[in-house]
């Protein structure tokens, strides 16, 4: 039987509601069973080890008072600590924090290990406080969450009747099926502090604090839940069929709390509160890995692919595509695809995506008129404003990735590329021991180089004499070379023989063309040596961007074995398969970002045309056969 939800909280990770008199009138219900008085904000403060505190803030409260309340309630040390709200470090003023927002409290320069326990509330405090909040509170007030609100009410009724959730055994992180009063699974809940490598991961994948690099280095531990919600909010008109998803504070005794001491006797199950993503559970017959793809509707594959392109999904494998039969036989066109697990989308840097559908025949079929119209109507800047409003904790670098990918999708679709071609342009070519930038990353690198040329040619009075335009590329420095990368002035992507343009392989139809290419490469290399150096700071000092034969070294720490099979007793850094970051967007100022976008859009058309010519050449060779040479 489930513990009564109004019982005293006895927990290592509980929401302890700090009591204070409630003055003034109450606002409308904006959560499940919770009211917030006028002039106040309710926020949720989470420590880097997963402890959660629900707080009612007055107008007079500041970052220091929030820390003090957390210290009193959870016995959490606040010396040398930082309170963050997405990218924003809250020094004192809390005006930027909206109601129902999650905040993260981290300790600066605090050495942690996988055995670091979650600091417990004082037992005296536990006896004095009761969790007077609702078992489920939705973080945010979007109208898109109306279905989730009703679902939360159904779950609350079921829990009060003693219908317990069930833990999901598969996967790397903690996940739980919550049920309605009839005992039917209606939602899957994924606590943020039970993600892979998070402090309370129930499957041994621990060793990181919340906010540190996670399974993907560009997606931080504890932030996949935000991305699940972002994917749902970005799926306008339910175009790709993403199930309703919201970020919630949820309380139950089933959740996992790792005991750092590993006591000899099992810990007593206690009510614990977590910040988690809550997504509608979709009954299905199988996933895409358990069935052939030939009967998948073209439109469903296209719609999911369009979403994956926009959000740069780095984890679209067949296991997170649910398949529902719409008739008894499941004949062609009679199945429905439901995409789930979007926690590794919207990375903070341009990552190498994984698109399972890229080689499916449906992806090579041209977009329909309805799909082209949907793509044309996408508004990346409007989408960013929506996410800033609904999920203000999403980091600005992730929003910039959304903008770049959506702009590319719109340009590519308008110029006749199919889904497979678009996906190929975004995907890196990986060879044993090497990782090379994708075609889109090459466009970004060239846009950066053109900005560098502009800075070298024009006076710097606009930006200030002491500002150096700098982009960091997080690649390992593998040689003793320390010379700055020199790029030719006037370099344009339209010239297929330009240094950066040649990062992508061209179609070679004969020996004569190959010989001409080699001669032109030698001439370009000679011209390169004569050009002045541009102040484009890069750590990739050993690499000439203009030559794909120069291999991009893998990020240090990359391993052959998969992190999915690694020993949980090794450090999280050892378990994470590294990925090189060729393009970093977070360091750009707003002015630099605006200029970069202009250059990026200018370079997209010639890059797309080049891809079309490559595809045409491949089709011609397929028709003629590989033995034919002219």
Swiss-Prot record:
Region entry G-loop, spans: 168-174
Gene Ontology molecular-function annotations: 1-phosphatidylinositol 4-kinase activity; ATP binding; protein histidine kinase binding
Region called Activation loop, residue ranges: 339-365
Gene Ontology BP annotations: cellular response to hypoxia
Span of domain PI3K/PI4K catalytic: 162-459
Record text on subunit structure and interactions: Interacts with AHK2.
Record protein name field: Phosphatidylinositol 4-kinase gamma 5
Native source organism of the sequence: Arabidopsis thaliana
